[in-house]
Amino acid sequence: MAHKKAGGSSRNGRDSHSKRLGVKKFGGEAVIPGNIIIRQRGTTWHPGVNVGMGTDHTLFALESGAVTFNKKANGRTYVSVNPITKAAE
């Protein structure tokens, strides 16, 4: 007897949800402690001054201030937060 698979949908048509990675706060933007600066896979950007790194390599602010990106001689890009100093009253 001749057999044929039942006509079904194609085997394609699946995809994963986007992970919304990337820079969330750009250079010069103000941040407060806990603000996420960058979501990444691996260490494309490295934490600098006043920046912490989570277990999933997310970079976040430890102090209030402005975000800066610095490229060092070793080829790595470091993300730092420069604190905003208030004038003495």
From Swiss-Prot:
<dbReference type="InterPro" id="IPR018261">
    <property type="entry name" value="Ribosomal_bL27_CS"/>
</dbReference>
<dbReference type="GO" id="GO:0003735">
    <property type="term" value="F:structural constituent of ribosome"/>
</dbReference>
<feature type="region of interest" description="Disordered">
    <location>
        <begin position="1"/>
        <end position="23"/>
    </location>
</feature>
<dbReference type="GO" id="GO:0006412">
    <property type="term" value="P:translation"/>
</dbReference>
<dbReference type="InterPro" id="IPR001684">
    <property type="entry name" value="Ribosomal_bL27"/>
</dbReference>
<dbReference type="Pfam" id="PF01016">
    <property type="entry name" value="Ribosomal_L27"/>
</dbReference>
<keyword id="KW-0689">Ribosomal protein</keyword>
<dbReference type="GO" id="GO:0022625">
    <property type="term" value="C:cytosolic large ribosomal subunit"/>
</dbReference>
<protein>
    <recommendedName>
        <fullName>Large ribosomal subunit protein bL27</fullName>
    </recommendedName>
</protein>
<comment type="similarity">
    <text>Belongs to the bacterial ribosomal protein bL27 family.</text>
</comment>
<keyword id="KW-0687">Ribonucleoprotein</keyword>
